[in-house]
Amino acid sequence: MPDLSLERACGGRVAGVDEVGRGPLAGPVVAAAVVIDAGRADPALLARLDDSKKLSAALRQRLATALLADPGVEVGLGEASVAEIDRINILQATFLAMGRALAKLAPPVDLALVDGNRLPPLPCPGQAVVRGDGLSLSIAAASIVAKVHRDAAMATLAQALPGYGWERNAGYGTAEHLAALDRLGATPHHRASFAPVREALARSALPGHKCVTALTFS
């Protein structure tokens, strides 16, 4: 289970950073940066935190709500849009979202613990932590908040663009999503730089195929 050992060892004001949404075919990539003040945060809440992938959707939602309301927890959220993903690639867009999340924290942190094995350019010193969401409470908290935020955003998009199942698959390339992409065509919220979307766009240019890429959605 994650704890605050890494944060305490580093000293100072430390944020855990994690992202969600690198793999989906649609929607933004989202990052969260979280600072936990162990002296003020609810210990019962901290005891329930874990890697977001190990938690049910309902529990993630409850924990994210509690984290955002806890006076001992600070949260910064950052996104990179589909247009940015297609322009600079998903890795660089992920790094951009992480930097934006950290920039939301004030005052700035002394160190960022970033989940993964690569350290992006950041507005502060950083340390990459492999499987950090299972080691660091602040990274685990960031993974939960980022996941819940992005899932909610995709559910909202699903209301405007029904048929792709985004409220269930969050834009990932499930069988349902791929079938809808073939049947309905790509939308402005699809990542044109990803192969399945690129192939769908090529098919949509053929006579008799539907294309919705000319539509705009707010």
UniProtKB/Swiss-Prot annotation:
Gene Ontology cellular component list: cytoplasm; ribonuclease H2 complex
Example of a GO biological process term: DNA replication, removal of RNA primer
Protein name, entry field: Ribonuclease HII
Principal EC category: hydrolase
Keyword Oxidoreductase appears in the UniProt entry: no
Pfam families: RNase_HII (PF01351)
Gene name of the record: rnhB
Subcellular location: Cytoplasm
Cofactor: Mn(2+); Mg(2+)
InterPro entries the record matches: RNase_HII, RNase_HII/HIII, RNase_HII/HIII_dom, RNaseH-like_sf, RNaseH_sf
Domain RNase H type-2 residues, every copy: 12-206
Family: Belongs to the RNase HII family.
Cofactor: binding comment: Manganese or magnesium. Binds 1 divalent metal ion per monomer in the absence of substrate. May bind a second metal ion after substrate binding.
UniProt-annotated binding residues for a divalent metal cation: 18-19, 115
